[in-house]
Amino acid sequence: MLLYLNNSALAEHLSSDLPYKLSTDDIFLTAGGTQAIEVVVSVLAQPGTNILLPRPGYPNYEARAGLHNLEVRRFDLIPERGWEIDIDSLESIADNNTTAMVIINPNNPCGSVYTHEHLAKAGLLLIYFTDHSNEIA
């Protein structure tokens, strides 16, 4: 386990795996995944916006969205295709008020790993958040 006394050392460490340099402003430490979800959802929740969540998926996203009056819309994952995103269900629920889409890769609870090609089909722009073990979340 690595212990950083300041965010500049953490930014330097994480930058070694990235094609760009992180600054201390890019880092927000939380006390685990639940708090991280709370922080992100609270920032995204604006009046009239919605968030797209996978079905099945981790229930904490919906619980946090509800606390902030953020409308939840669900898109399906297709078990017969390795739990890929159902592009048709996604297109039918996304609109100009969609503020975010949750993608968990590798997926929990299904265990699937989306390919770059599948994500490109979905027309997704992904921002990768790196946790303490450098896994993509």
Regions found by a protein language model. Name each.
Residues 1-12, 106:
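A structural motif shared across PLP-dependent enzymes of the aminotransferase-like
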Residues 78-137:
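Active-site phosphate-binding strand-loop segment of PLP-dependent enzymes
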Residues 67-73:
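A short helix-loop-beta submotif of the ANL/AMP-binding
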Residues 55, 74-80:
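Short beta->alpha connector loops at strand-helix junctions that form conserved
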